[in-house]
């Protein structure tokens, strides 16, 4: 999927995260993480985000994450929502989302 414009998903409430995704003109995935649990779970959060982007075939994006202790399932859902909003997806293929 090609990121067409910036988009957000999520909140800054406890146990949630806010994802901002935008086109990366330099190419590739650039991930900026700000997390209350980064010291302990930063690597795992990055893995979930990158795996989700790879599964959605997003190869060029600047992703900024502000995490407040979200679980993996929430991270995946928020990244998926931000990507679909940034790509203007109208018909969601629910079977392709995991």
UniProtKB/Swiss-Prot annotation:
It holds the Pfam family ACP. GO terms for cellular component: cytoplasm. Belongs to the CitD family. Its main location: cytoplasm. The keyword Phosphoprotein applies. This is Citrate lyase acyl carrier protein. Oligomer with a subunit composition of (alpha,beta,gamma)6. It comes from Vibrio cholerae serotype O1 (strain ATCC 39541 / Classical Ogawa 395 / O395). Keywords: Cytoplasm, Phosphoprotein. The modification O-(phosphoribosyl dephospho-coenzyme A)serine is found at residue 14. It is found in: Cytoplasm. Covalent carrier of the coenzyme of citrate lyase.
